[in-house]
Amino acid sequence: MFNNSRDAFAIAQAMLGQNFNSQDESDWNKAAELLAEQKDKTNPVYVMDEVFNLMESGEYAFATYYAGDYALMADNNPDLGFCFPKEGVNIFYDAFCIPTCAQNKKGAEAFINFMQEPQVALENSEFIYYASPNVTVRENEDSSLYGNEAVYPEEQPE
């Protein structure tokens, strides 16, 4: 179980057929009830590093996890598999934000522009094992992540 509320609730909302971005309080309450039920039915581990270690070592049989972390775990344990639930998933990309109170906005913008240069974005994506929003990275056939369905699913959810 994810130790951040946004991702944990997204799982419950998908199971209930709700929109991940629902603003309806009753949707959130129903999702909270469903999450509370899992405590009695499973042996939940909430610290993601612990889940990572238990999955990578083969001690746990399955877990909900981030695609990029799965890709890293699979490099160390080829017996691991990955699937998307039929209820759906949220697509995640790391993002950069500049606070409105930033003292060096131009420097922050220059850094973001640098990180989105094709070669830099490719190296960053391969280092962290996560999808890049940069199309040149996703379509780069020389990338170690090219064709990795966990990181770049063929069929995008609606």
Which residues fall in each region the model found?
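Extracytoplasmic ligand-binding site segments that recognize negatively charged/polar headgroups
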Residues: M1-E56
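Structural recognition of the beta-strand scaffold that forms the well-ordered cores
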Residues: M1-F2, A10, P44-V45, A61-Y65, ...
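Solvent-exposed loop/turn segments at secondary-structure junctions
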Residues: S5-A8, G68-A71, G88-N90, Q103
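Sec-exported extracytoplasmic/periplasmic mature domains
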Residues: Q13-Q18, A36, D40, E56, ...
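Short, hydrophobic alpha-helical packing/hinge segments within bilobed ligand-binding/sensory domains
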Residues: V51-L54, Y70, A108, A121
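A ligand-binding cleft/hinge motif common to bilobed small-molecule-binding domains
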Residues: E56, F62-D79, I128
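Extended hydrophobic/aromatic segments used for targeting, binding, or gating
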Residues: D79-F84, G88-Y93
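Mature extracytoplasmic/periplasmic domains
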Residues: N90, D94, P99-P157
